[in-house]
Amino acid sequence: MLYSLVKKYLFSLDAEIAHEKVCQILRTLSSSPFLCRLIHSQWGYKNPKLENEILGLNFPNPLGLAAGFDKNASMLRALIAFGFGYLEAGTLTNIAQSGNEKPRLFRHIEEESLQNAMGFNNYGAILGVRAFNRFAPYKTPIGINLGKNKHIEQAHALEDYQAVLNQCLNIGDYYTFNLSSPNTPNLRDLQNKVFVNELFCMAKEMTHKPLFLKIAPDLEIDSMLEVVNSAIEAGANGIIATNTTIDKSLVFAPKEMGGLSGKCLTKKSREIFKELAKAFFNKSVLVSVGGISDAKEAYERIKMGASLLQIYSAFIYKGPNLCQNILKDLVKLLQKDGFLSVKEAIGADLR
């Protein structure tokens, strides 16, 4: 009831202004351990059936917040309090950048979806590291999503990813290389097997922490499988599928620029993930993201082969009790099918 009133006010504002107001509150909350405990007592949820150790990291539950919400790693403590099993901060770039021109964030309310053309706006890796360390250590795993600066030419992309990773080596529990945002010119062209191989070979020499590749939902299936295979062969520990889509047919009134996320992406993301899991389940850690807004969809993705999940748009539309609702209902679904833990259900449809 309370969030419905808050949501009504926030949705009366420009989408990016509303987001920044929420971020200001979350940054303030992060500075207060007492308030974070209070939030967690209201909206957190803990159940041993949902716990899992993956790549040496202990996840209290499989539901994470996707990159893009906390771009500068400045409100992680407050976000954890809402019940997420892990968070992904960023996207951070080596040098600060302002992103694309405003307006660049839009709501498609009927479809419970968002369209963003942000363009990796962030304060840069140095300040991101400083913000991260302010409240570290954290109670859940934290991933760091890394991107290329807009002004860097393709020929120097590998050096740029090397530079931003180097800046972030002392923060986070895993790293995700973002080659799939549609909002940096030509970035998606880097989703080819040669560059991906070079990228992960380079990264494996720099860190022993887990490395993930985040892919676009708009790749042809064969191309996607080729790129993913190249990443895994070069040392990638996991694949995150998927980023936002540029398929404008999924909403009634799309804007010219930007990627779509939310419910409009559910079917497309699920189909891509199904093909990914058929080829790479048990060969890599698979993370499903895109249009997950309830326990039923979360459970389907887990049975399809997802060890972990991420949400974003649904958190905007459904509010702070979303994690708790999904996780409680997920436990019921596991029990109904006779699974003793979420770990047992991963990939059940493939067995």
UniProtKB/Swiss-Prot annotation:
<dbReference type="Pfam" id="PF01180">
    <property type="entry name" value="DHO_dh"/>
</dbReference>
<comment type="pathway">
    <text>Pyrimidine metabolism; UMP biosynthesis via de novo pathway; orotate from (S)-dihydroorotate (quinone route): step 1/1.</text>
</comment>
<comment type="subunit">
    <text>Monomer.</text>
</comment>
<keyword id="KW-0560">Oxidoreductase</keyword>
<feature type="binding site">
    <location>
        <begin position="312"/>
        <end position="313"/>
    </location>
    <ligand>
        <name>FMN</name>
    </ligand>
</feature>
<feature type="active site" description="Nucleophile">
    <location>
        <position position="181"/>
    </location>
</feature>
<comment type="similarity">
    <text>Belongs to the dihydroorotate dehydrogenase family. Type 2 subfamily.</text>
</comment>
<dbReference type="InterPro" id="IPR005719">
    <property type="entry name" value="Dihydroorotate_DH_2"/>
</dbReference>
<dbReference type="InterPro" id="IPR005720">
    <property type="entry name" value="Dihydroorotate_DH_cat"/>
</dbReference>
<feature type="binding site">
    <location>
        <begin position="243"/>
        <end position="244"/>
    </location>
    <ligand>
        <name>substrate</name>
    </ligand>
</feature>
<dbReference type="GO" id="GO:0005737">
    <property type="term" value="C:cytoplasm"/>
</dbReference>
<dbReference type="InterPro" id="IPR050074">
    <property type="entry name" value="DHO_dehydrogenase"/>
</dbReference>
<feature type="binding site">
    <location>
        <begin position="67"/>
        <end position="71"/>
    </location>
    <ligand>
        <name>FMN</name>
    </ligand>
</feature>
<feature type="binding site">
    <location>
        <position position="91"/>
    </location>
    <ligand>
        <name>FMN</name>
    </ligand>
</feature>
<feature type="binding site">
    <location>
        <position position="183"/>
    </location>
    <ligand>
        <name>substrate</name>
    </ligand>
</feature>
<dbReference type="InterPro" id="IPR013785">
    <property type="entry name" value="Aldolase_TIM"/>
</dbReference>
<dbReference type="GO" id="GO:0044205">
    <property type="term" value="P:'de novo' UMP biosynthetic process"/>
</dbReference>
<dbReference type="InterPro" id="IPR012135">
    <property type="entry name" value="Dihydroorotate_DH_1_2"/>
</dbReference>
<feature type="binding site">
    <location>
        <position position="145"/>
    </location>
    <ligand>
        <name>FMN</name>
    </ligand>
</feature>
<feature type="binding site">
    <location>
        <begin position="116"/>
        <end position="120"/>
    </location>
    <ligand>
        <name>substrate</name>
    </ligand>
</feature>
<keyword id="KW-0472">Membrane</keyword>
<feature type="binding site">
    <location>
        <position position="71"/>
    </location>
    <ligand>
        <name>substrate</name>
    </ligand>
</feature>
<feature type="binding site">
    <location>
        <position position="178"/>
    </location>
    <ligand>
        <name>substrate</name>
    </ligand>
</feature>
<keyword id="KW-0288">FMN</keyword>
<protein>
    <recommendedName>
        <fullName>Dihydroorotate dehydrogenase (quinone)</fullName>
        <ecNumber>1.3.5.2</ecNumber>
    </recommendedName>
</protein>
<dbReference type="InterPro" id="IPR001295">
    <property type="entry name" value="Dihydroorotate_DH_CS"/>
</dbReference>
<keyword id="KW-0285">Flavoprotein</keyword>
<keyword id="KW-0665">Pyrimidine biosynthesis</keyword>
<feature type="binding site">
    <location>
        <position position="214"/>
    </location>
    <ligand>
        <name>FMN</name>
    </ligand>
</feature>
<dbReference type="GO" id="GO:0005886">
    <property type="term" value="C:plasma membrane"/>
</dbReference>
<keyword id="KW-1003">Cell membrane</keyword>
<feature type="binding site">
    <location>
        <position position="291"/>
    </location>
    <ligand>
        <name>FMN</name>
    </ligand>
</feature>
<feature type="binding site">
    <location>
        <position position="262"/>
    </location>
    <ligand>
        <name>FMN</name>
    </ligand>
</feature>
<dbReference type="GO" id="GO:0006207">
    <property type="term" value="P:'de novo' pyrimidine nucleobase biosynthetic process"/>
</dbReference>
<comment type="function">
    <text>Catalyzes the conversion of dihydroorotate to orotate with quinone as electron acceptor.</text>
</comment>
<feature type="binding site">
    <location>
        <position position="178"/>
    </location>
    <ligand>
        <name>FMN</name>
    </ligand>
</feature>
<feature type="binding site">
    <location>
        <position position="242"/>
    </location>
    <ligand>
        <name>FMN</name>
    </ligand>
</feature>
<dbReference type="GO" id="GO:0106430">
    <property type="term" value="F:dihydroorotate dehydrogenase (quinone) activity"/>
</dbReference>
